[in-house]
Amino acid sequence: DNTLGALPGDVVLVSVISHANGNRREEGRIVRILEHTLTSVVGTFQKNKNFGFVLPDNQRILRDFFVEKGKDMDAQNGDKVVATILDYGNEHKNPQVEVTEILGAKNEPGTDVLSIVRSYGIPEEFPQEVLDSLDSIPEEVTEAEKIGRRDMRDFHTVTIDGEDARDLDDAISLTFENGIYHLGVHIADVTHYVKEGSLLDEEAKNRVIPMLPRKLSNGICSLNAGTDRLALSCLMDIDEEGTIVNHEICETVICVDRRMTYTMVADILDGAEAPEEYKDFVDDFKLMKQLSDLLRKKRSGRGAIDFDFPESKIILDEKGRPIEIKAYEHSAATRLIEDFMLLTNETIAEEYYWLELPFVYRIHETPDEEKLRTFATFLNNFGYSLHLTNHTIHPKELQKLLSRIEGSE
């Protein structure tokens, strides 16, 4: 062993023992550990009669960590623990640690997530100065905040999400008048509260779980039913051919009338009797379905391909344990939200393209030319042809091919 008991991240002095030769890399031997950077370890506790060990989750650490009796916090065999390093040991002696936190039993729901969070030092709590900055953010939208915004509160507006959705960040409104669909897609205006360069903004850049304090994500930035909320809205006027004839991107104030789920809306569209509280919205959902079908037909006409791949959904019990795995159902409700969001994205992207403003676009690269030729040859062996134009392929050509192949054996 040429590591001298060093741990990942240690700063070491190395002596070269063999130089690179052909495919063989240069080899060295650690002669001195200059600095230890690892201060704690996450792993599985293993208990013996008079002492214990922590078996590290990090597979780059090839040593177990010794736990002296009385320094294990009464951890049990198989518990996931966080342990502080007391002695780094050496090449002949295992490092010594003290258990400072028990994350839970190894197979207990949630323990795996906590283990990853602790291992990588992912921040869970917000710094106090960030929490203090929330004091200036109101619990409800104030009258002053509504000034200068388009008032959309008189329009029937709904959110449609999964049953387990917590942060409701988009809503839909739709009316039809004189042959024109007036579609509004409203996104919670988080930037009104999280200003660029603010403490909240800087903290959010380094976070995922959660990115923003719950006061924002579950509160004033969540489009909860029955409360005024600030939104950024894309208002689109669409004719009966599915063409946008006018649009506006603006700051609005909205009030969601109902929180709906995909299941509820799908059942209503399938003809189920709507609960009393939703009866005033049945015509809205039918109108949404009508527009969704129109948009989908128009996209299909330009060659769009519907990659309807099967997805799985894991059902958990109240303790977070998986009890069922079932196919994720794509319904008329999920499709209409997909269609409206796609149309919104296209509209906004085109707006900023013509304004020549800096913008982040999601662009799919054209297929590799060599792979296309190989694919075309493969298809020819089965009696199908693929027409290439300028060494690439138009989506419409793929759409036609899939249509011909569908149902064949």
Describe each region flagged by the PLM.
Residues 32, 36, 40-409:
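Conserved, carboxylate-rich catalytic/transport cores that coordinate ions
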